[in-house]
Amino acid sequence: MFHCIPLWRCNRHVESIDKRHCSLLSVPEEIYRYSRSLEELLLDANQLRELPKPFFQLVKLRKLGLSDNEIQRLPPEIANFMQLVELDLSRNEIPEIPESISFCKALQVADFSGNPLTRLPESFPELQNLTCLSVNDISLQALPENIGNLFNLASLELRENLLTYLPESLTHLQRLEELDLGNNELYNLPETIGALFSLKDLWLDGNQLAEIPQEIGNMKNLLCLDVSENKLERLPEEISGLTSLTDLLVSQNLLEVLPDGIGNLKKLSVLKVDQNKLVHLTEAIGDCESLTELVLTENQLL
């Protein structure tokens, strides 16, 4: 059970307030008493519908949690939060992010997942301190062409959107370690995707991919590659270059053979190739000396 303690019982110099799961219909007025000291405000899982003007006087905020509410608008005054480092607005009813978000220069972690957004503001790539960005399940149709300006990004989650292509600048994200593009409408990948040398986890499941560019073999640090539920008829021989790979998931595709180069994946421990059209298995798979899980069900193996 959650107990929401009245703030007037607390010290006037308050740096953190946690009012999660308190059935709040509006932002408590007493919070504004601490505008000179408040750095962390957690109002997640309430029933908030709007953020009033006094809310944006909390200019010392460094962490703001507003997930799982019913907020219908993010006002341009969000620009006041110039010291904000973490922002969670996931699972609300916000239809757009104002261009003024670009003034939140200190922002490092942002989650806008589960809102009825169709686009990110053009100014968004100006948030160059961002390291983690989550925009899952928001009906996103395209990324800003200059998304590559977010050069400090380490994690980018774009799952369950309506993306049909990736801008070339995406491959400028040289510090990116996690990229989740699962359940979109991607038909192809840019050849330059192989330039994401720091990438460790790449999820491309549930798209419309018919092929993977051979340049993917340049991702020497990749640990997990998920391309299941696509329309792949072959894997490039260059996949042999993924020498750090531990998990390769290619279930539910149209593969008839696996490339011989798969035998070079000495660290591969999980290989899932179920629900394809395999008619035989390359002997090279015997060279995958770390393999502990091999799934081949629902193929046409003789």
Predicted regions: what they are:
Residues M1-L302:
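The feature captures the LRR N-terminal capping module
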